[in-house]
């Protein structure tokens, strides 16, 4: 039988009524399998997938952070946020994924009360850092494309770094209740045996899981996604309008700026798409269980859906470096140079990916055929680049 980290939903009704389905992000329930083949596959395949996720994720995210820290040309506002994403992913890969993989080798929760308090909070913190950073990145792209003249020209790296720290502070604070209410409980079984499990809320009534799942879905998925969608609606509208209304004398200059900004907007949008694709099944599954925990199918099919959703959610922590590698020429060159025996990174001077730090002409895309709004800001050698160095 698969490891019993959580209550078995196939228990009699009397027992089920007093046992609440734990959070899908922490010590998920695995239904009983009907044979040893499924058990063998689960115990071998899933931990192997987790090992691949951890290895690939650590390599990609560590390399990403190293490139941004060691190359001054890569230190831009968006890259600070992208590094923040990588840091959150590293936290998840180093803590939550190994703990989750251990469920396939142990039948009970083996990390004690302290682990039960910390692991759920760490995972929620990591998810918060990811989704809030993606929202901040979308807001940055909105300002760069729709309102470029509203962007700061001095102290921007410090200010952006403070924003990144603020994202971590908010994410930790929002995860505090998870640490407060998570507890190790002994769960009874229909064969008069019992096992310990870590659950994220008190075992009192069925209202707690419903409130918990709805809040998680709203705060860590739906609300940020709506905000990001609004930003990208205005970004798309501005880019489409500017493509038709730019006069001929500004076409060449503004076309390069538009391509640079559109490229970064595309990268951020891919990050958002990966996050939605990887986490949406987990959120939906948790909502379904929270509102129908007495009726959940304990079959092998339901177990497979659970495992797929779980693997997908953790996979999100290793996909961003791949997306960046495919979409960013400069990151790809730096990454390849790091892999090739630590050779010196390529100096980044490509105007299609990096704006000069000595003089940057910031042109508003809000223009029309009759009245072109063209604003220029000259930045000295110590000023910070407003566009991504990708």
Curated annotation (Swiss-Prot):
Glycans are attached at residues 8, 192. One of its GO terms (biological process) is G protein-coupled receptor signaling pathway. InterPro entries: Bombsn_rcpt-like, GPCR_Rhodpsn, GPCR_Rhodpsn_7TM, NeuroB_rcpt. The modification Phosphoserine is found at residue 352. One of its GO terms (molecular function) is bombesin receptor activity. Residues 1-41, 100-117, 178-211, 288-299 are extracellular. PROSITE patterns: G_PROTEIN_RECEP_F1_1 (PS00237), G_PROTEIN_RECEP_F1_2 (PS50262). Residues 1-20 are annotated as: Disordered. GO terms for cellular component: cytosol; plasma membrane. A lipid is attached at residue 341 (S-palmitoyl cysteine). Keywords: Cell membrane, Disulfide bond, G-protein coupled receptor, Glycoprotein, Lipoprotein, Membrane, Palmitate, Phosphoprotein, Receptor, Transducer, Transmembrane, Transmembrane helix. Residues 66-79, 140-156, 236-266, 328-390 are cytoplasmic. Its main location: membrane. Belongs to the G-protein coupled receptor 1 family. This is Neuromedin-B receptor. It comes from Rattus norvegicus (Rat). The lineage of its organism: Eukaryota, Metazoa, Chordata, Craniata, Vertebrata.
